[in-house]
Amino acid sequence: MDVFSDGAEFWNQRFNTPDYIFGRTANDYLREKATLYLAEGSTVLCVADGEGRNSVWLAKQGMQVDAFDLSTLAITKAKQLALDSEVQVNYLLASSDSWDWRPNQYDAVVAIFIQFADPTMRARLFAKMMSTLKPRGVLILQGYTPKQLEYKTGGPSILEHLYTDGIIRDLVGGMDIIDLSVYEKVLSEGSKHTGMSALLGLVARKTL
């Protein structure tokens, strides 16, 4: 059985611990690229945001952040992290299919390790993320590549959920690719993303 077939139950079980399983610190790739390409006051959507580490960091930079996740426990922990950090984030309980994807809504969409999606769902999700960006809006994404199956230091063990350069180029066709990097790096993001990792990072800008 695919562990993602009941996503809410799967993620509620994973998040059912006092610890922040991916840590409280924002993803390194996001911090680097947001500093370069996002401005204070930008409207940002964080997709499948989990326990809030990325949305809270963006709010600390002065951005207006909406974030959703399908796990009630993740939302509760994210709200607490925002409260502890003295920032405001608009958290909503939703899946990637039930979220209200309004067109031309955001200056940026942030998608960090959203590899719960099989190829069919992934194509649908990327189309929605691009649609909800304003013209000249920026998509910042990080995920694992197939080599991650050798490292086993985080992410799904399902090959078709992982990213390649070619897959991502096809999915963001029509956008201007600012950065598309495939690389290896030691991660230290809580207990679930720890050790040498095979990564892909993307920054792309909507043209229309």
How would you describe each model-predicted region?
Residues M1-A39, K147:
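Conserved class I S-adenosyl-L-methionine
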Residues T43-L45, G52-D97:
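Class I SAM-dependent methyltransferase SAM/SAH-binding core
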Residues W99-A108:
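A short acidic, Gly/Pro-enriched loop at the edge of an enzyme's catalytic core
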Residues F116, G143-L149, E184-K185:
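Short "lid" loop at the C-terminus of a central beta-strand within the Rossmann-like core
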Residues F116-M129:
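A short, conserved alpha-helix within the catalytic core of class I
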Residues R136-G143:
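Conserved beta-strand signature within the Rossmann-like core of class I S-adenosyl-L-methionine
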Residues E150-I167, S191-G195, L199:
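Acceptor-substrate binding/catalytic loop of class I
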Residues E160-L180:
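Short alpha-helix
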